[in-house]
Structures are given as C-alpha cells and as structure tokens.
Amino acid sequence: MNKSIAPAPVVAAGDVKFGNSLPLSVIAGPCQLESRAHALEVASALKEIATRLGIGLVYKTSFDKANRTSAASARGIGLDAALAIFAEIRDSVGLPVLTDVHEAEQCARAAEAVDILQIPAFLCRQTDLLLAAAATGRIVNVKKGQFLAPWDMGNVVAKITTAGNQKVLVTERGASFGYNTLVSDMRALPIMARTTGAPVIFDATHSVQQPGGKGTSSGGEREFVPVLARAAVAVGVAGVFIETHPDPDHAPSDGPNMVPLRDFEALLRTLMEFDALAKKRPGAGTI
C-alpha cells in the first residue's frame, strides 16, 4: 500500500476526458446488457450523437444487475457472454465502455474488455472489491452510497489510491430520504470535488429512482432527470451519467428512470450550454 497519493485531477478513457474544470463528458447507455444486437444498436446511436455534438461519451451497461428488488427480476446475460460484446463496442463502435462489478473476482476479467470498472453505491465501502478494482489499473468509478455523506467519499477514494491507482471518478446518485425516496443535495458535488480531489460525476437517472417503489421493482420519475441534470451541470461537474433506452417502458430494469433515446440528444445539447456557462468558456451565455 502507498501513502498520501492524490487521485488524478483529469482521468482519460480513450479520447474521453473527465475533469472538474474540463468541458462536460457523459456516461450513457441502457441499464442492462440485453443482447449483442441491442447493445450495438444503442452504442452506435450514442456514438453518432456524441460525434455530432462534439462531446466525449463512455458507453455504460451492466452484465449483471445483482441488486434487483425481487429474486424473480431479470439480472442480465452474465459476464461470460458480455465480454465479447464489450470488446466489440470498443473496437467496432469506437466507444470506451463502463460496467459494474459486484465481486472482487469479477474485476480482472471485466478489465480485459472495459475501460472503467464501476463500484455500485451499495458496495462503495467494500474494501476487497475496491482493492481488486484498483489492481486492474483501469479507471474506477465509485458511486457514493445513499447512506454516506459526501465527505465520507474521501476514505473510499483513499482505499483505491493507496493501492496505487490514481484513476478514480466519484459519482453522486442521491441520498436516502425516508421510504422509497432519494434526494439530491447539490452541495455534495463541490464537497466531493474538494474532499476527494477526484473528478465528480452526477448520476441524473438513478437520482430520480424510487428504490423498491413498485413493490417487486423500483419506480422512478424520469421527468425530473433534466431538472436535476441541469442543476448539477450548473454547479459544475466533470460528467453526467444518464441511462437511456429506445423503449424504457419495456426495459428489463430501471425503465421508469431511464431517458428515452429519442430525447437524449436534445438533453445533451442543453447540458452542454449550461456547462459552458458554468465554466465560463467561449460561447457561454447562450442559454
């Protein structure tokens, strides 16, 4: 273990750069990896949008949804089937890829085909998982637990950096507030930037999730995704995390809080304008 290693202020996944003072980048894709054809369809559409807008984009999808509300809910195609699809998205579509890992043993295998390993919020304090992810040398994106204060993420980041990996992102996704409800405290964004030194991501879609809100599955209020995303980008963040799907009402997981793919480009255009104003780059003031 190393001592007093600061996280990198700018983290690059291929050509996509995340930095709190850099132009906004985005992490986007469907909640669950449903099939090769579906993944390539969505990844190709997102690549076209990102190229048209000139914004950095990392493709996100999960090979296993290990924390579903009900044991009967669809979990995904599994790591074995997902690896070749992840590699194809990177090589053929040309997008960096992010996926969740839930167990230490998954990290090295997933790292063979993805650029960013994501630690789910419920697991953000699991030391062995964090150390295994750090050991791969890949970027590690840690979602802040709904039960943590933003300044508590300093200890989480330190577990990764003292293991020798400075490539860390921290993601805000709301805090538990009573039953089946999350709230987003925008103060958490600059606090996490200050106390961790890492690039900060705002998860706009999971922040409107209603955990367990539909009894055997989670609910969500997708109409508030643009509201919270605009607020976070106005504060100033390195990136936004937005789950999107061609038909979210029939998606196997997280449909109620995913943005329809047809609405994705317009939302990004707005967020880029807010970002330019927040960071006072040329072109700011066009909102």
Curated annotation (Swiss-Prot):
Single GO BP term: keto-3-deoxy-D-manno-octulosonic acid biosynthetic process
Lineage: Bacteria, Pseudomonadati, Pseudomonadota, Alphaproteobacteria, Hyphomicrobiales
Compartments in which it is found: Cytoplasm
Catalytic activity: D-arabinose 5-phosphate + phosphoenolpyruvate + H2O = 3-deoxy-alpha-D-manno-2-octulosonate-8-phosphate + phosphate
Key words of the record: Cytoplasm, Lipopolysaccharide biosynthesis, Transferase
Organism expressing this protein natively: Rhodopseudomonas palustris (strain BisB5)
Protein's UniProt name: 2-dehydro-3-deoxyphosphooctonate aldolase
UniProt xrefs under SUPFAM superfamilies: Aldolase (SSF51569)
A Gene Ontology molecular function term of the record: 3-deoxy-8-phosphooctulonate synthase activity
Annotated Gene3D superfamilies: Aldolase class I (3.20.20.70)
Residues spanning the membrane: none
Gene Ontology CC annotations of this record: cytoplasm
InterPro entries: Aldolase_TIM (IPR013785), DAHP1/KDSA (IPR006218), KDO8P_synthase (IPR006269)
Name of the gene encoding the protein in the UniProt record: kdsA
Statement: the UniProt record of this protein carries the keyword Metal-binding: no
One Pfam family from the record: DAHP_synth_1
Broad class of where this protein is predominantly found: cytoplasm
UniProt pathway: Carbohydrate biosynthesis; 3-deoxy-D-manno-octulosonate biosynthesis; 3-deoxy-D-manno-octulosonate from D-ribulose 5-phosphate: step 2/3; Bacterial outer membrane biogenesis; lipopolysaccharide biosynthesis
